[in-house]
Amino acid sequence: MRAYLQETELLNYSHPLIQQLMNSRQWDRLPKKEQILGIYNYVRDEILFGYNREDTIPASEVLQNGYGQCNTKGILFMALLRAVGVPCRMHGFAIDKQLQKGAMRGWYYQLSPKEIVHSWVEVQYEDKWLNIEGFILDIPYLTKLQQKFGQCTGSFCGYGIATDDFQNPDIYWDENDTYVQKEGIVRDFGIYDSPDAFFSVHQQRLSPFRKMMFSRVVRHLMNRNVRRIRQGK
C-alpha cells in the first residue's frame, strides 16, 4: 500500500504551491469521503478542461496552469489524494482520436495519431478500488457543450467526451465510479503504481517535430476551441 501513497517526480505534493493549496482548503481535516469529494470537485471544476504542453508535467505545473486534460488532471488529482493519505493508482488506456474531434480540427486533427494515450485514477475507498475519470471536463464547459448539442440525448463522442448518456454522464462522485471518456477506449494498458511508471512505458505517438508542434501551436488552437465552447460561441 505504501507504493500508492508515495511522492514521485510527477506527484510532487510537497511542492510549495500544492502545500499552499492544501493549507487553504484544509482537506486533511475532513473525513475520508469528504476529502475525496472535495479534491474531486476541485480538480473537475476549478482546474478547467484544457491542453497542457505535454502529459508528463508535475502536479505543481498543472496547478499553476489552472487547466488540464485526462492525464494531467489525473496527475494533480493523485498528488492531492496522496497528500491527505488516500491511496491511489493509475490505469492506462488508449482512446480513439475521434473523442477529440471538435476540440481538435482540420489539419491538426488529420495529422494526429489514431490512438491517444489516456488514463483514469483508481482510488481506494472502503476496501475497494473506484474508477475515477469524471473530473476531466469542468461543469461550465460540459453544460455549454450539452446546450450546443441539446438534441442529443443518447451517446456522444467528440469535444473531449465519449459517453452513452450525453445529457447525464456519470461525473458526480458519491462513493461510485465516475466516467466521461470511457466509451472512447480502444485498448487497456493495465494498472500502474504511479503516472511516472505509466508514462515511462506509454507515451503519445508523436515524432519530435509533431511533439514540438503540439506544444507550441496545436494545443493553443485546441484551447481556443475549448474556450469558445465554454463561452457559448
Spans of features found by a protein language model:
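Glycine-centered secondary-structure boundary/capping sites
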Residues: 17-26, 79, 144-145, 188
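Residue-level signal for well-ordered alpha-helical scaffold segments within enzymatic catalytic domains
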Residues: 41-42, 79, 83, 119, ...
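Active-site neighborhood of thiol-dependent amide/isopeptide-bond enzymes
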Residues: 51-116
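Generic structural hydrophobic/aromatic packing signal, biased to beta-strands
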Residues: 22, 81, 88-90, 132, ...
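His-Asp-centered catalytic microenvironments across diverse enzyme cores
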Residues: 10-13, 95-233
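Secondary-structure boundary elements
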Residues: 1-65
